[in-house]
UniProtKB/Swiss-Prot annotation:
The keyword Lyase applies. Keywords: Lyase. NHase catalyzes the hydration of various nitrile compounds to the corresponding amides. It is an enzyme of class 4 (lyase). Heterodimer of an alpha and a beta chain. Pfam families: NHase_beta_C, NHase_beta_N. This is Nitrile hydratase subunit beta. Changing residue 40 to V: In strain: ACV2. Its EC number is 4.2.1.84. The keyword Membrane does not apply.
Length: 212
């Protein structure tokens, strides 16, 4: 799903300052910021009510202006709260009573997701691949900037994981696939105005096809 959550490579936001090996500071800057991860793993591991990919997708479903005005960790509080209402763990009235006022949630899903591909190709390190040029209305873990682009496999995981486009919607046909590190020339992704170098993207097998 294209949206405000996938801004990498989008023009108009200015240059991103970057210093190699810079100290980015602590993970959490306020006492409450660990809360969304605690809530998320309570819902995933303790209750078994939803998956991590469902959490990612529910954050993507936030109303765009709400998303842009909300701090990073607060988005995940909203996301987990939305899932708890959708799964029947809480009602929105109970949530707003606990919050002491209105508690805007993510928008309802407009997609049922899609099943994992039945047939995929296993790739080897050094093999050139093309990212499938697919526009998906629901959850997907493929950055828009690499759709249709050609890169080289630099690593294949030994583990397999549920296909995000399915499990992110709570489907039971997610299957399991390995992921690959795919190395792209910066020019392949962003054109000749880049400062050179390369970009490595972690992609599921179902997103890839052999490059011609």
């Amino acid at each position: 799903m294209d949206g405000v959550h996938d801004l990498a490579g989008v023009q108009g936001f200015g240059k991103v300052p970057h210093t190699v090996n810079a100290d980015i500071g602590p993970t959490f800057h306020a006492e409450w910021e660990h809360l969304p991860y605690s809530l998320m793993f309570a819902g995933v591991a303790e209750l078994g009510a939803f998956s991590v990919d469902e959490v990612r997708y529910v954050v993507e479903r936030m109303e765009p202006r709400h998303y842009m005005m909300t701090p990073y960790y607060e988005r995940y509080v909203i996301g987990v709260a939305t899932l708890m209402v959708e799964k029947g763990i809480l009602t929105q009235d109970e949530l707003e009573s606990l919050a002491g006022g209105p508690f805007p949630l993510s928008r309802p899903s407009e997609s049922e997701g899609r099943p994992a591909p039945v047939e995929t190709t296993t790739f080897e390190v050094g093999q050139r691949v093309r990212v499938r040029d697919e526009y998906v209305p629901g959850h997907i873990r493929m950055p828009a900037y690499c759709r249709g682009r050609v890169g080289t496999i630099s690593h294949r995981t030994t583990e397999k994981w549920p296909f995000p486009d399915a499990i992110g919607h709570g489907r039971n046909d997610a299957g399991e696939e390995p992921t690959y590190h795919v190395k792209f020339a910066a020019e392949e992704l962003f054109g000749s105005d880049t400062d050179g170098g390369s970009v490595v993207v972690d992609l599921f097998e179902g997103y890839l096809e052999p490059a011609a």
